[in-house]
Amino acid sequence: MRLFSTTLLIAALTLVSCTTTHVGKPREAPGPVSLICIQENSRVVIDDILDVLDQGFLRNGIETRLFSVSEPEDCSYVLTYTARRSWIGVPFMRYAHLRLLYEGSVIATATYTGGLDTNPYASNRDKLDPVIDELVSGF
């Protein structure tokens, strides 16, 4: 019984501590995505997040444009995001959530959760590139 309890505890801790990525696509994009306007989130204090997002979309053949207040009229696709960081000696990104909208309706979401990642100090690019790739796959 004790061995079973210990095994169960280790399995539970492993599941909770893993890095997870979740992508949801409630709706298909009506056509190819060539431009995504990214709404700047001034509450996110992760310095390179906009560069990481821009480069991630460019790698997938999608141009980006940044806006802070008014959504540009010629942008059908808009990305909103939030991200959080933690500290263990130095800051690192532990969570990011991306929402892709088409004409105001959510068509896809993607979330990165670091948990008790074995490498929390990996670059933000290494953490978000697979999330971005999965978010736009099939568009």
Predicted regions and their residues:
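Solvent-exposed loop/turn segments connecting transmembrane beta-strands
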Residues: V44-I49, G89-V90, N119-P120
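Active-site-proximal beta-strand/loop segments in catalytic clefts of secreted hydrolases
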Residues: N41, V69, T82, Y112-T113
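A structural "domain/chain start" motif
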Residues: R2-I10, V16-I62
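Envelope-exposed proteins and targeting segments
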Residues: S34, N60, Y77, R94-A96, ...
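Amphipathic beta-strand/beta-sheet edge segments enriched in Tyr/Trp
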Residues: V90-G114
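C-terminal/domain-edge helix-coil "capping" segments
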Residues: T19-A29, G56, G114-F139
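A short, hydrophobic beta-strand-centered structural micro-motif
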Residues: L66-R85
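Short, flexible, glycine/charge-rich loop motifs used to bind or transfer phosphoryl groups or to couple energy/partner
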Residues: K25-R27, S68-S70, I88
